[in-house]
């Protein structure tokens, strides 16, 4: 069984993943896969450098993720170019990791922030959506990424609204409360997995 984990930016997916890993389950982290591919010499690094030039690199030749983010979120054409380049490479890499893990794990998870936006729904037997109300999401994103309200709203707007993701979810984990309530929901869901009725 493969379970997809998704949710809006700053919704609390990382905390959910920590609880799942602590329970002994494997989780493929799409953001980490992307990060690895963007390392100097990686497939995405080379593809992005070819598309946007050396202006997206730091002095030491590493990818300047902050500069790249600013370029993408401020310009829809740049975002479209980047998405077209990256999505295929990322999909290939995630599929390889999924297929490898499926050989040894009966149940595992894949944390993909923009799962619905990229059309990954068919990969999963179940999808867990981490939900947070819009105001809380905005405040958390501003605090976490040190963004002003305008930039935070811009990032949130680049993703499918959470309400449009809900119909795809087999489980909605509500993270509008405190961390203890979030952990309890995840532990309960994991218990149901281990002991299906």
Curated annotation (Swiss-Prot):
<dbReference type="GO" id="GO:0005524">
    <property type="term" value="F:ATP binding"/>
</dbReference>
<dbReference type="InterPro" id="IPR001977">
    <property type="entry name" value="Depp_CoAkinase"/>
</dbReference>
<dbReference type="InterPro" id="IPR027417">
    <property type="entry name" value="P-loop_NTPase"/>
</dbReference>
<keyword id="KW-0173">Coenzyme A biosynthesis</keyword>
<keyword id="KW-0067">ATP-binding</keyword>
<feature type="domain" description="DPCK">
    <location>
        <begin position="2"/>
        <end position="197"/>
    </location>
</feature>
<keyword id="KW-0418">Kinase</keyword>
<dbReference type="GO" id="GO:0015937">
    <property type="term" value="P:coenzyme A biosynthetic process"/>
</dbReference>
<dbReference type="Pfam" id="PF01121">
    <property type="entry name" value="CoaE"/>
</dbReference>
<comment type="function">
    <text>Catalyzes the phosphorylation of the 3'-hydroxyl group of dephosphocoenzyme A to form coenzyme A.</text>
</comment>
<comment type="similarity">
    <text>Belongs to the CoaE family.</text>
</comment>
<dbReference type="GO" id="GO:0005737">
    <property type="term" value="C:cytoplasm"/>
</dbReference>
<dbReference type="GO" id="GO:0004140">
    <property type="term" value="F:dephospho-CoA kinase activity"/>
</dbReference>
<comment type="pathway">
    <text>Cofactor biosynthesis; coenzyme A biosynthesis; CoA from (R)-pantothenate: step 5/5.</text>
</comment>
<keyword id="KW-0547">Nucleotide-binding</keyword>
<keyword id="KW-0808">Transferase</keyword>
<keyword id="KW-0963">Cytoplasm</keyword>
<feature type="binding site">
    <location>
        <begin position="10"/>
        <end position="15"/>
    </location>
    <ligand>
        <name>ATP</name>
    </ligand>
</feature>
<protein>
    <recommendedName>
        <fullName>Dephospho-CoA kinase</fullName>
        <ecNumber>2.7.1.24</ecNumber>
    </recommendedName>
</protein>
């Amino acid at each position: 069984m493969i379970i997809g984990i998704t949710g809006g930016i700053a919704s609390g997916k990382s905390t959910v993943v920590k609880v799942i890993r602590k329970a002994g389950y494997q989780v493929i982290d799409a953001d980490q896969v992307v990060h690895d591919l963007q390392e100097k010499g990686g497939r995405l690094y080379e593809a992005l450098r070819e598309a946007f030039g050396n202006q997206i690199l730091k002095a030491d030749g590493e990818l300047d993720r902050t500069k790249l983010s600013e370029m993408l979120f401020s310009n829809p054409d740049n975002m479209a170019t980047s998405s077209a380049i990256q999505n295929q490479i990322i999909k290939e890499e995630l599929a390889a990791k999924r297929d490898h893990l499926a050989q040894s794990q009966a149940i595992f998870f894949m944390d993909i922030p923009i799962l619905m936006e990229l059309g990954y729904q068919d990969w999963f037997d179940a999808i867990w959506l981490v939900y947070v109300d819009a105001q809380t999401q905005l405040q958390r994103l501003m605090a976490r990424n040190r963004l002003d309200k305008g930039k935070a709203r811009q990032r949130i707007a680049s993703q499918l609204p959470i309400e449009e993701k809900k119909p795809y979810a087999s489980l909605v984990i509500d993270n509008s409360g405190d961390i203890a309530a979030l952990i309890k929901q995840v532990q309960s869901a994991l218990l149901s997995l281990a002991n299906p009725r």
